[in-house]
Each structure stands twice: as C-alpha cells, then as structure tokens.
Amino acid sequence: EIAYGEMDSLLARKIQQLMTFFGLLIPDMTNEEEQMLDEALIKTYRDFGITHDNDSVYEDKSQFPPKMKKMPVLGDLPQAPAGNPMTQRLAAIVSRFVTGSAQSFNRQTNVDLSNKYIVLDLSELKGKLLPVGMFIALDYVWDQIKADRTQRKAIFIDEIWQLIGASSTRMAAEFC
C-alpha cells in the first residue's frame, strides 16, 4: 500500500476512491462512462481549488494538523450535458443521491472522531444502500486514521461481508 506521503497526487487517490464508490452505484459502468466521470470529478475538484498539487488541498498548512479545504459533495458534480446518453445515464443514477430518497449522502460528513470509541451505525441502510454507506464510512474513517499516524488505532467492522461479498465489485474488495 502506498502511504499518502509517498503518493504523487492526493487528488488521484481521492478520485480512485470515488471511482470505487461509483462502481458500487453503477456496476456496469462502461470505459467511456468511467472516463467522462473521471473528467467531471477532476473539474469539480478544480472548481474547489484542488488540483494534483498536494498543497492545494490545504486551506492553512501552518496549523497542526493542517486545515483542509472544504471538499465537494455529489451535488457539486457538473450537470450532465443534454443530448449525451452516457452522461444522462450517470446523472440519472446519481440523482437519487443528490435530490432523491438517498440525498442524505449529499452533504459533508459530520462525524466527531475525537471520542475514544466511535460507533457508526448503518443498520438503517438496506439493500443497495448498505454497501454504499459502508464504503463511505470506511473511506472516511480510513482517511482520518491516516491523517495522524502517531496514534494507535483499531477498526472493528461488523458485517463487512456486505461490502466485499458476492454482490459487490472487485474494486470495493480491494479497497478493504
């Protein structure tokens, strides 16, 4: 595994994580759709001032830990251009998570990780939303853990098979 400090681009790592997330949402995504999504993600992060320059993710690097910029949410992705069936399909699937019944995924994470023990209860998520929610929670926790490597931490994940089980994607299993 490549540590953040050894990676060429934090943005590339984040987009790789997002491609895994979208792979859970859209398991039959074509190569062309993946390319269009990749371009849309890079543009979205660029609109937030975040580029492949790792320093661009920080609002203030003089603090410890450094203060990061506000990150985009799903609703910040550009709207699909009219007339393009591939982007229209992606937009239709993602709209459930932006304005539809799963719009709670379209916001900044508000989990306080300063307590000694933290429980992320995803028991209310059912069906296709459970692996998506588990992936998002695990991705967030992993990013927080890697932010300060001076502290020892342990993660216990109940029901992880639902993220990496038979109905999941190879990319999600590799992430875990």
Features from the language model and the residues they span:
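P-loop NTPase motor domains
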Residues: 1-176
